[in-house]
Curated annotation (Swiss-Prot):
The keyword Isomerase is annotated on this UniProt entry: yes
Lineage of source species: Bacteria, Pseudomonadati, Pseudomonadota, Betaproteobacteria, Burkholderiales
UniProt-annotated catalytic positions: 8, 131
Pfam families: His_biosynth (PF00977)
Protein name stated in the entry: 1-(5-phosphoribosyl)-5-[(5-phosphoribosylamino)methylideneamino] imidazole-4-carboxamide isomerase
Protein family (similarity comment): Belongs to the HisA/HisF family.
EC number: 5.3.1.16
MF annotations from Gene Ontology: 1-(5-phosphoribosyl)-5-[(5-phosphoribosylamino)methylideneamino]imidazole-4-carboxamide isomerase activity
GO BP: any one term: L-tryptophan biosynthetic process
Enzyme kind, highest EC tier: isomerase
Native source organism of the sequence: Polaromonas sp. (strain JS666 / ATCC BAA-500)
Entry keywords, A to Z: Amino-acid biosynthesis, Cytoplasm, Histidine biosynthesis, Isomerase
Listed InterPro entries: Aldolase_TIM, His_biosynth, HisA_bact_arch, Isoase_HisA-like, Isoase_HisA-like_bact, RibuloseP-bd_barrel
Length: 246
């Protein structure tokens, strides 16, 4: 079970949002590269970066901070990035800088042809982020709810050749209210590619519950507010996951 610390970038700083609201952000660090190093030192095997300004602007906005993170830890662990990635040139630029995975969210839903092209050009490097509320997919930094069912889109994108899917329950993100295990497992069981859980991770019980369903296809979990607030000790949680799932 991969526990993947999230580093959300806003104006070059590491922040956390509550339910995706840019106006409800807390700055946790003004040095994202040092933050990345600290998670690696605590045993992280992958990092999850989000360019928040980019997600809302539709183009990269925190590239300098991202490249500093990649220079600091990119040669040691896999790094994945989402937010504002809407064209092949941006993907190529980030992969050349040492990024392992690019996460495509809104653009995958609105422009499936772009996702197909990305999977063809950069096979093995493309992850889709599906954000949903009550089983329906949301786009545009969670501001728009679509009529698409998560499982239907998951199957479609799997056929395109995406590496894995990050499933975020946006009703729970940043609320420390517990992962929506049931919905995550439902998606994982419907697919043959791995699913990464996200949104609401709060404590060690969540980690243990996720380890119980790893064999259903749940590969990992994005760790956000809980590891920054101290509700979850990251190093202890990763050690527990390794103990449970070897």
């Amino acid at each position: 079970m991969l526990l993947i610390p999230a580093i959300d970038l806003k104006d070059g700083h590491c922040v956390r949002l509550k339910q995706g609201d840019m106006d409800q952000s807390t700055i946790f660090s003004e040095d994202p590269a040092a933050m990345a190093r600290s998670w690696v030192d605590k045993g992280a095997r992958r990092l999850h970066l989000v360019d928040l300004n980019g997600a809302f602007a539709g183009k990269p906005k925190n590239e300098a901070a991202i490249k500093k993170i990649l220079a600091e830890v990119g040669s040691e662990i896999d790094v994945q990035l989402g937010g504002g990635i809407r064209d092949l040139d941006t993907i190529e630029r980030y992969l050349d800088a040492g990024l392992r995975y690019v996460i495509i969210g809104t653009a995958a839903v609105k422009n499936p042809g772009f996702l197909q092209d990305a999977c063809t050009a950069f096979g093995g490097h493309i992850i889709v982020g599906l954000d949903a509320k009550d089983g329906k997919v949301a786009t545009d930094g969670w501001s728009k709810l679509t009529g698409h069912e998560v499982i239907d889109l998951g199957k479609k994108f799997q056929d395109y050749g995406v590496e894995s899917i990050i499933y975020t329950d946006i009703g729970r993100d940043g609320m420390l209210s517990g992962i929506n295990i049931e919905a995550t497992v439902r998606l994982a069981q419907a697919l043959t590619i791995p699913v990464i859980a996200s949104g609401g991770l709060s404590n060690m019980a969540d980690i243990e519950a996720l380890c119980d369903v790893e064999e259903e296809g749940v590969e990992g979990v994005i760790c956000g507010r809980s590891i920054y607030s101290g509700d979850l000790d990251f190093a202890a949680a990763q050690a527990r996951a390794d103990e449970l799932n070897g």
